[in-house]
């Protein structure tokens, strides 16, 4: 590939006005030939990052060609000292380097499915071969792991033109995470198997299979390198909401089952009885066996049959049982545990295998080094429930004590079924499906994302993908039109089940609307303004103008300048900022955009670049739809950061899942509860929100608070578990 790109660049005629502009910019850099290896490596890193950190619009293994090309162009321009660089030149450079990967069959170009959208860059099965790219070329740029703890990236320190406080909890949290030492679980690595190589006929399943193939190759290649190190450290970054992410895109604790199964804390600790309890809970949850209502095991202490009948369910999975019964599962399956075999029937086969090896390690040494996690129960809804003090929501998401864990997705599914009763087709469809399939294919993802303001159209899109992946389209005849209808009803169902969170989201939207404000066009109607602008554009496009046309152009320009946008409501700000409990200053921007379009030729194929570039005018609709998810994400980020900052043990960080040594889980759970309660003990958190988001205190009416006592979390077994 390096040879191909080098030849292509060397053939560029610098005197030809029509020559590839990207090639010209690279070729005119002195010593460009010597930089081709790192330039190709950084291109690979960016494409891989785009494939793994995809936006909601793209599946794993896909990315937008325009956005990917732009990022590559910026990075290459920086390395060849060509910054600042115009957008169109960024794209020509990016296209040049992407072509190398397309030409050699590592990626392919897919036309957009809708007008005015970017081409899609998609990994081919051959992409996995790039895991063999030499380590001395890529160094840490794709590995993201180091032999020594790394200092915090300086770019993270100066956020939005203000200096960070080195003692702020979010800064301390990042430092603590970067001081956690890891090692590779070589026992698990030895039993890693490749995903199936046969192509799937189902498009959704094939996309998942291809993603797993790519993931497998990269994770194992990196693990083979890191297993030779006694320990390694990883670096982290913070986004604009304060959320903490691994910079390594694959082999990290925020990644997949395989990645987590391969990771151990490098420093073992003595295990105690509490540690054995939590290791048993963890082991059972990783396997997560399901039992039919008529086959509940004798070792279960609770009456799950009555519970299932009440919920309309036919099965219960171990992760919905009490903690004691999860331990009971592990005790009843010692033969399975001590066989230490990869069992693909497990929900998380590699994490289960790692827990099996951990039991062997515990028996032999009395020590433990496996990360054992406690997971939040629908974490977004937990924060919304705590803010609104909605007791009913609290019951569904573990803020209130209960004997058997409530299933949030089942509750929304049951309400959905009631709402669909007037639609004969939907009623027949839902009656043909067992509740577990309604929960998995129809209710789950939509109920999860609604907490972050997902609308019916996005929920329908995700729902249709899920039912295709589960083959429910064939089994039950579910169509895209059905998903559109079901998504609208699901939104209503969720809003009925969780009225407090709904009011909280609406309140956040109203505050955002007031803070940004409303501007009206003064001087005439929008139609008149548009007509004048169109006429000026028409006159300017003519080239030479006669005297009458020049006079008209001058008059039109004067009329256009007489139009003004004036603030008629609210504060008229262009951004919304707030300080989170961790000391992080979140800054949310959402500007109107204009379309940028450009034609290009890539690997002999005509493509169209489409990009929305921001203006300097705030997008009030964008602010209103985005404020709730961004605010809630900033709160879950603050919760985790406050826990980590006050934690002196090892920590595996996922936004709603915290891991540590088994012996320390009790202490971590107590710390997790304590921090959350302290965040929301405020009698009226709506006051805090209003003070943070806007300097106005009277114009937006607060919702009524519910009766939830967040202190009840102390007695809840299912808050994090």
Where are these regions (language model features)?
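Active-site palm subdomain of RNA-directed nucleic acid polymerases
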Residues: 636-654
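Short, surface-exposed charged micro-motifs
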Residues: 235, 650, 657
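Short glycine-rich phosphate-binding loop at a beta-alpha junction
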Residues: 508, 652, 659-662
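Catalytic palm subdomain of template-directed nucleic-acid polymerases
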Residues: 659-672
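Non-catalytic nucleic-acid-binding interfaces of large nucleic-acid enzymes and RNP effectors
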Residues: 1-447, 451-631, 646, 669-670, ...
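Short cationic amphipathic helices and targeting signals
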Residues: 245-246, 656-660
């Amino acid at each position: 590939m390096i040879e191909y790109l080098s030849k292509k660049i060397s053939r560029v005629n610098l005197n030809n006005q029509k020559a590839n502009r990207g090639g010209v910019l690279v070729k005119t850099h002195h010593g460009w030939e010597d930089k081709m290896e790192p330039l190709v490596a950084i291109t690979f890193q960016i494409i891989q990052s785009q494939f793994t950190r995809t936006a909601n619009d793209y599946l794993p293994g896909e990315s937008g060609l325009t956005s990917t090309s732009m990022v590559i162009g910026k990075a290459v321009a920086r390395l060849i000292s060509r910054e600042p660089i115009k957008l169109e030149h960024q794209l020509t450079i990016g296209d040049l380097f992407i072509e190398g990967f397309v030409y050699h069959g590592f990626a392919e170009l897919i036309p957009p499915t809708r007008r005015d959208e970017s081409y899609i860059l998609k990994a081919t099965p051959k992409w996995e071969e790039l895991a063999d790219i030499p380590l001395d070329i890529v160094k840490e740029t794709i590995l993201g792991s180091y032999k020594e703890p790394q200092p915090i990236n300086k770019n993270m320190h100066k956020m939005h033109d203000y200096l960070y406080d080195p003692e702020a909890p979010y800064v301390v949290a990042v430092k603590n995470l970067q001081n956690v030492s890891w090692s590779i679980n070589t026992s698990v690595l030895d039993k890693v198997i490749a995903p199936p190589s046969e192509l799937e006929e189902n498009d959704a399943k094939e996309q998942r299979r291809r993603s797993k193939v790519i993931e497998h190759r990269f994770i194992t290649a990196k693990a083979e390198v890191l297993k030779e190190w006694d320990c390694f450290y990883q670096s982290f970054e913070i986004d604009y909401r304060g959320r903490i992410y691994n910079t390594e895109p694959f082999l990290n604790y925020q990644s997949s089952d395989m990645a987590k199964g391969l990771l151990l804390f490098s420093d073992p600790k003595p295990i105690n009885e509490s540690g054995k309890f939590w290791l048993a809970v963890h082991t059972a949850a990783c396997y997560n066996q399901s039992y039919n209502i008529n086959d509940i095991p004798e070792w279960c202490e609770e009456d799950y049959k009555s519970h299932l009948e009440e919920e309309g369910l036919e099965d219960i999975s171990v992760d919905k049982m009490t903690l004691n019964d999860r331990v009971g599962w592990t005790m009843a399956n010692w033969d399975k545990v001590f066989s230490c075999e990869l069992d693909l029937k497990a929900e998380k086969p590699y994490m289960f295998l790692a827990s099996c090896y951990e039991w062997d390690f515990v028996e032999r040494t009395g020590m433990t080094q496996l990360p054992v996690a406690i997971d939040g129960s629908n974490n977004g809804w937990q924060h919304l429930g705590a803010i609104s003090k909605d007791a009913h929501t609290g019951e569904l998401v573990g803020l209130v004590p209960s004997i058997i864990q409530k299933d949030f997705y089942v509750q929304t599914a049951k309400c959905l079924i009631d709402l669909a009763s007037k639609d004969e087709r939907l009623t027949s469809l839902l009656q043909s499906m067992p509740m577990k399939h309604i929960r998995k294919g129809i209710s789950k993802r939509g109920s999860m994302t609604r907490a972050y303001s997902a609308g019916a159209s996005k929920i329908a899109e995700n729902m249709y993908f899920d039912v295709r992946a589960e083959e429910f389209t064939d089994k039950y005849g579910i169509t895209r039109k059905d998903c559109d209808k079901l998504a609208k009803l699901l939104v209503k169902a969720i809003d009925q089940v969780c009225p407090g969170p709904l009011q909280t989201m609406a309140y956040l939207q109203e505050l955002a609307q007031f803070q940004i404000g409303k501007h009206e066009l003064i001087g005439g109607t929008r139609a008149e303004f548009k007509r004048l602008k169109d006429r000026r554009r028409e006159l300017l496009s003519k080239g030479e103008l006669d005297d009458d046309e020049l006079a008209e152009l001058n008059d039109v320009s004067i009329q256009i300048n007489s139009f003004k946008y004036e603030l008629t409501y609210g504060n008229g700000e262009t951004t919304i900022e707030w300080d989170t409990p961790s000391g992080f200053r979140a800054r949310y921007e959402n500007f109107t955009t204009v379309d940028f379009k450009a034609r290009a030729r890539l690997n002999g194929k005509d493509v169209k670049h489409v990009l929305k570039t921001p203006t300097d005018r705030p997008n009030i609709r964008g602010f209103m739809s985005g404020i709730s998810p961004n605010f809630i994400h900033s709160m879950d980020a603050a919760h985790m950061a406050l826990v980590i900052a006050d934690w002196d043990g090892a920590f595996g960080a996922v936004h709603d899942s915290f891991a540590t040594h088994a012996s320390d889980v009790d202490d971590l759970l107590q710390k997790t509860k304590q921090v959350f309660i302290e965040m929301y003990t405020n009698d009226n958190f709506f006051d805090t929100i209003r003070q943070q988001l806007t300097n106005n205190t009277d114009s937006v009416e607060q919702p009524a608070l519910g009766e939830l006592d967040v202190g009840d979390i102390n007695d809840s077994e299912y808050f994090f578990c």
